[in-house]
Amino acid sequence: MKVINIILASIIIYLGVGSTCFSQENDKALLERVDKVYRLIPIDLNTDELLQKINEVEKYVGLVIDSIESKEAKEKARLIQAKGLLWSLGSYVFETGDKGLKDELSKRIKWVDLDSPSLELLDDIDVANLLNGYFRLFMPDLSELDRATYVLYNIKSEKIRNPYVLTALVSTLKQNGYTDAIQGVIEDIELCSKTESTIQKAHELKAQYYPVRVGEMAPDFEMEDEFGKMVKLSDFRGKMVFIDVWATWCGGCVEGLPYFMALRDQYKDQKDLVLLTISDDGIEAKSRWLKFLKEKKYSGKVPHLIINKEKDNFTKDYCITGIPRYILIDKEGKIVNAWHVAAKHELFSWAFNMELENMNRK
């Protein structure tokens, strides 16, 4: 109990909660108080301590909301309060599965209507946090795209649903590329959205990612290797090609590279498989790249290429928005998976072996 009182005192001092008189503050400042107090609640407490903390914070927030003058700002504060509960108490429920606390949270936010026009009072980030907090707790089986579909069909406000759905679309495309599920959401946007700019953006994303979906011809490229020789993807036609897109400055890439390089020995008898690395360091950082390859003893073991950002379209053609990226191409030069799981992933061997087997059947 002593610990929780110290934590609570810290929050009070930080927010200046010693007084319950907020008459000198404008509505904007009071809204910021409501938002901040929930973000300061730790969730590494036991159930009783957390509930006590939440009750204290809720009491404080109630006083703040009572001090807000405009009706619109009061409603916005209540929505921020709901968001705060979903990401404080809600996070604890999500981690522990505590049914009693979930029921308690449900009672506290039962007034929330996701289709309420009041949600337009929030900015896009707060709307997304409120919706995602709600979905995470009460519709946990929905994927990010499923959530977008739910919003399209159950929330009337274009101001609310357009940015939420487009954000989900972009996020999923960056993680998985163009899939049937993506196609379904774009069709839902065409059907549900009344905003031309939203439909146009969805079409632009389709045009960007569709060419690198499964089964399409992989865009050819030509890059310099570590020995100064120009190498094309098409040079390897008739062989399967597995590519690791990385950079020396990328911690996750450097961490994953040994696993990728180890595939050389694991698949040494697979003569129709080419392992290939492509560095995003850029030709201007060639010396650093070469030094890294030599120091790590990777030089000469597989073809190592480097992007010339001034003339290569590789990053654009393959929709490289983050690295590391792994790309698998079949013997005919068609994309098997342009968002392949990393070699260090626990499911890699199972997935990769199955893909190799399927490609060799053709």
Question: Could you describe each region identified by the protein language model?
Answer:
Residues 1-25, 359:
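Bacterial Sec-dependent N-terminal signal peptides
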Residues 240-241, 273, 324:
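Alpha/beta-hydrolase fold active-site loops
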Residues 24-220, 224-227:
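Oxidative protein folding and maturation machinery
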Residues 270-286, 298-311:
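Thiol-based oxidoreductase modules, predominantly thioredoxin-like and allied folds used
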